[in-house]
Amino acid sequence: MTKVITTINEMQSIVKQHQREGKTIGFVPTMGALHDGHLTMMKQSVSENDLTVISIFVNPLQFGPNEDFDAYPRQLDDDVAAVKKLQVDYVFHPSVDEMYPEELGIHLKVGHLAQVLEGAQRPGHFEGVVTVVNKLFNIVQPDYAYFGKKDAQQLAIVEKMVKDFNLPVHVIGIDIVREKDGLAKSSRNIYLTSEERKEAKHLYQSLRLAKNLYEAGERDSNEIIGQIAAYLNKNISGHIDDLGIYSYPNLIQQSKIHGRIFISLAVKFSKARLIDNIIIGDDYID
């Protein structure tokens, strides 16, 4: 039976009890408004661990002053009903005051990995992410933590944090879950108008175009980016907010493609900014 926990003390007490019993703990951090991408991660955690904890916490530290913190969808009852069907053991749902009872005196700073892509567009965003993930890791103390590859930059940063701080957590990246037409599942898709939703399938189609160019031998980043942009400008009303090709997971911008690379795309529609990506290269598996 799924139980909702709202305090840090109770969550830590539960974790300690299960650790004493030698149980493995899987953890899926979320901000709620759960979709199939989240549920896929939870299913994997349930199948691989004795105990699964998810968090539902809309973290104010990762929202900028002009972003959608107050408008971010909150649907706790629906989310809890969904995870109960998956036999998730605990939902950790703290308040903002519970997580941040006073102003932080210690701040984590992310280097180069937060200065490109989403980090360049959203200053301070990834500092907020690593702060809350670090706190959640300390509270839940998972053996395995599951993150979606749709937020590939976030995944790279969390993996780097775990490595740099010797955290005893195995980070598992889960493949992007998509709608039938290819649109990546996202809590922000609900902001799309009906016409924008029809157009949004072209984000993934543009990335497939890039993959086809790569497989045909194209290695010039500018050529691939140019063709992606031309395709999108022809097929969507949204604005291309960011488009680039980077090494992965080091996120160094590439002019000539070699090794494993990450093509990142962000498109801003009227009320939604959608991101998508594709990873290709020497060890790429579709």
Swiss-Prot record:
The region annotated as signal peptide is none
Where beta-alanine is bound, by residue? Q62
Q: Keywords for this entry?
A: ATP-binding, Cytoplasm, Ligase, Nucleotide-binding, Pantothenate biosynthesis
List the catalysed reactions.
(R)-pantoate + beta-alanine + ATP = (R)-pantothenate + AMP + diphosphate + H(+)
SUPFAM superfamilies listed in its UniProt record: Nucleotidylyl transferase
The record's section on InterPro entries has:
Pantoate_ligase, Pantoate_ligase_C, Rossmann-like_a/b/a_fold
Gene Ontology BP term (one): pantothenate biosynthetic process
- The record's EC number reads 6.3.2.1
Locate the residues binding ATP.
31-38, 148-151, 177, 185-188
Coiled coil start-end: none
Location of the active site: H38
GO CC terms of this entry: cytosol
Kindly list the places in or outside the cell where this protein is found, as annotated in its UniProt entry. Answer: Cytoplasm
**Pathway it belongs to?**
Cofactor biosynthesis; (R)-pantothenate biosynthesis; (R)-pantothenate from (R)-pantoate and beta-alanine: step 1/1
Give the main localization category: cytoplasm
Q: Which residues bind (R)-pantoate?
A: Q62, Q154
List the GO molecular function terms.
Answer: ATP binding; pantoate-beta-alanine ligase activity
* Subunit field text: Homodimer.
By sequence similarity, the record places it as follows: Belongs to the pantothenate synthetase family.
Miscellaneous note of the record: The reaction proceeds by a bi uni uni bi ping pong mechanism.
NCBIfam families in the record, alphabetically?
Answer: panC (TIGR00018)
**Purpose of the protein:** Catalyzes the condensation of pantoate with beta-alanine in an ATP-dependent reaction via a pantoyl-adenylate intermediate.
Under which name does UniProt file this protein?
A: Pantothenate synthetase
